[in-house]
Amino acid sequence: MKNYLLFIGSLLMFSMNIFSQKIEKIKLTTLEIPKEYKLTENSHCKSIQANLLFKNPEMYQMIYGKIKSKEIQNFESSQDSGSILYLEFEKDFESENFIKGLIWGKSKKPTDGNPEEIFVKKNTVIIWSFEKESVLKELSKKKIELEMK
């Protein structure tokens, strides 16, 4: 029984490491971040909805399923600030319309008040919470496009 529990514990640690590796692979590294930007601890989400979704994802888990892992990168420069939210779900994400409605409301697209852009692929959701024109957002989008083909 003791060996079985050790085996199960090892599997859980291994699977948690694999999940975090997926997000780590698509996050911007310090070498990829332009010099004028710095990583910060403070959230720079542009809308309350994006911030709430990241901080309390279990609030909506009955709709979109359980989250395996989540991470956020917060950036600021003299000209720009924003956050990239990374959410990884246990199963393929099938609630894209719900997330769009939650973030954008009736417009179903980015607005001045809710400028976030949303990317969904399999079980991963990425939300860029920046103003519409952002060098860092475009850099991240290109990396994710390459990494998640």
Regions found by a protein language model. Give the residues of each.
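Sec/Tat signal peptide C-region and signal peptidase I cleavage site
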Residues: 16-20
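Intrinsically disordered, low-complexity regions enriched in Ser/Pro/Gly/Gln/His and often acidic
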Residues: 66-68, 97, 121
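A short, solvent-exposed beta-edge/loop patch
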Residues: 21-33, 74-90, 99-149
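N-terminal hydrophobic targeting signals that begin at the initiator methionine
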Residues: 1-2, 24
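Sec-dependent N-terminal signal peptides
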Residues: 4-14
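Secretory pathway targeting signatures of secreted, lumenal, and periplasmic proteins
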Residues: 38-80
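Primarily extracytoplasmic ectodomains and periplasmic/lumenal surface modules that are beta-strand-rich
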Residues: 92-94
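Short, functional N-terminal and low-complexity linear motifs
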Residues: 3, 62-67, 107-111
